[in-house]
């Protein structure tokens, strides 16, 4: 949303309580994103705690603590982006025997069945990943039970790609490098600057980085982060390889159309840049 408002000419300031923006991402990826946001004119204030918000009618005053300093800032509007929760308040569940989880979602099994027979829950209300395409897969799981064999379940979808539509997009699937190391994998890391991709020059957008973590023992892909033009499309190819349990060499040796962002996988997987 910050980039959307920024593109309309709005001055945007991001307040983040963490030491850096995108704390879940690997530092090299986060650094690239923050640099591009800053270049776009977005002001970022990390390690900031908001202490008070005062609505003055036409303006909003924020009182915040950054380090040892107390500050105030005035804005036209404030957008609160601190997460989401299932919207179940109007469903009347208190009149049923449908159980809830400790996080306030409808409790379901891996076939999305609730604690009441013949009642299923799909979408954000069941506490799963809150993405439109996951809700569509929820639908397929339930339809499979009603009209087919009933084999589909949430256990089948361990590989879920995600994309944040920044400029350029940031796409993820599986584990990033830090998570893979923490999980104890014998890890190979592959990286490629977007500047090396011919299609990026065609698009006149050479910002970003491709980064993939591979299990050195099995050669299976553990996860990928793509920060680049068309990353939201390319990530699906890597997700498919992970779902099919293909060794990374299958993507390295594929023949791709040219010029495309996906052909960069040929070069990306040539040589690991980190062995750990």
Q: Residue spans of the language-model regions?
A:
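Rossmann-like dinucleotide-binding cores of NAD(P)H-dependent redox enzymes
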Residues: 1-69, 129-136, 144-179
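Flexible, glycine-rich terminal cap/loop adjacent to redox cofactors
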Residues: 165-276
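Stable alpha-helical structural segments in soluble proteins, enriched in small hydrophobic residues
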Residues: 2, 135, 139-142, 146, ...
């Amino acid at each position: 949303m910050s980039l959307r408002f920024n593109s309309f000419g709005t001055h945007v300031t991001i307040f983040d309580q963490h030491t850096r923006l995108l704390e879940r991402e690997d530092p090299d990826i986060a650094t690239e994103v923050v640099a591009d946001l800053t270049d776009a004119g977005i002001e970022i204030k990390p390690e900031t705690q908001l202490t008070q918000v005062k609505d003055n009618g036409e303006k909003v005053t924020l009182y915040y603590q950054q380090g040892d300093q107390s500050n105030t800032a005035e804005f036209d509007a404030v957008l609160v982006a601190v997460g989401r929760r299932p919207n179940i308040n109007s469903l009347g569940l208190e009149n049923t025997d449908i159980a809830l989880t400790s996080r306030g979602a409808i409790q379901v099994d891996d076939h999305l069945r609730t604690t009441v027979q013949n009642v299923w829950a799909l979408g954000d209300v069941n506490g799963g990943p809150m993405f439109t395409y996951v809700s569509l897969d929820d639908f397929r799981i339930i339809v499979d039970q009603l009209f087919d064999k009933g084999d589909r379940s949430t256990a089948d979808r361990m590989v879920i790609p995600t994309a944040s539509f920044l400029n350029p997009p940031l796409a993820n699937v599986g584990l990033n490098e830090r998570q893979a190391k923490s999980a104890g994998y014998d890890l190979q890391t592959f990286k490629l600057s977007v500047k090396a991709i011919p299609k990026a020059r065609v698009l006149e957008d050479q910002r970003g980085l491709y980064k993939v973590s591979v299990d050195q023992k099995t050669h299976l892909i553990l996860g990928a982060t793509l920060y680049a033009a068309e990353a939201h499309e390319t990530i699906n190819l890597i997700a498919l390889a992970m779902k099919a349990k293909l060794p990374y060499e299958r993507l390295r040796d594929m023949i791709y159309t040219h010029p495309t962002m996906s052909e960069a996988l040929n070069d990306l997987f040539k040589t690991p840049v980190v062995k750990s």
